[in-house]
Amino acid sequence: MLHFVASVICLNQMESCDSVNVLSMEKKMESKLIVVAIGGNSLIEDPKHVSVDAQYEAARKTAAHIAHLIKEGHRVVIVHGNGPQVGFILLRAEYSSDILHPVPLDSCVADTQGAIGYQLQMALRNEMGKIGCQREVVTVVTQVEVSPNDPSFQKPTKPIGSFMTKEDAEKKVRDHGWAVVEDAGRGYRRVVPSPKPIDIVELETVRSLLEHGEIVIAAGGGGIPVRRDADGLLHGLEAVVDKDYAAALMAKRLNADMFVISTAVPEVCLNYGKPNQKQLSSMTLAEAAQYTAEGQFAPGSMLPKVNAMADFVKSTGNLGIITDPENLYDAVYHGRGTRMIL
């Protein structure tokens, strides 16, 4: 398991980007709070590049696009996925089960928050430095409260780990009792319980950091799933919270001006992967509901992204965008991606 110690941050000294060292009142008024959700698969470019070095390089490429948003003076909260990375930890635990103790899922999520948070922190600092921008970046180990009675504990749906062939998936079912599903036509993946988030334990910590000008990485992997008992004490649960739902909850509670989900495609598509595939530049809440009812969006893939975005837009009336990492800046400034509106 990975262990890390959070560094102590001096909150009374805020560094701002060199190019906007003294922000004018007009610029401050233009500054927006943007919550950006990054998929765990966005941090792994392909099955042949899964080493730690390769994951950092993928994180660097994504961070480069976010850095340009930060340089414009925006406040940013980053929520990252961890599906493949949690799968790697569980696979290591499986291979070493004869000599080491098992690793519960909540601890796996905590491990990935540290490891991926570290990669993103370093990448963001480096990429901001390249463009003359200096801001503090901090990762918050984040617990997310869920209900122990959530129906997902009886019916696992959340894909984690790497993609498998049908033969490999069937072997995991036979040998280890895994629940597996075919994921968006790209292969088979293990599925685990994915309860809906109902509260973010460290929300006020995130809010305080934002008020002091920090760039915050929080609720990584959807947050560490915990339940609260009758005495108000927290307990970890064997589950993985969907990072899109956790990010939407974060964006709502912070009243973010904009919620952006970064995924593998530049725009949401109808008839995805078919000859009549159609890209959407915009989508209303009514259209999102219609397309969902038609089965246009795959569960465990685009469906939770559309649902999470619709929840945010309906609750706040603010702008939601779904796009890929390469188009993050252009999505905010030049209308790229799929924009969800009321």
Specify the residue positions occupied by each region the protein language model found:
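C-terminal catalytic "cap/lid" subdomain
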Residues: 26-342
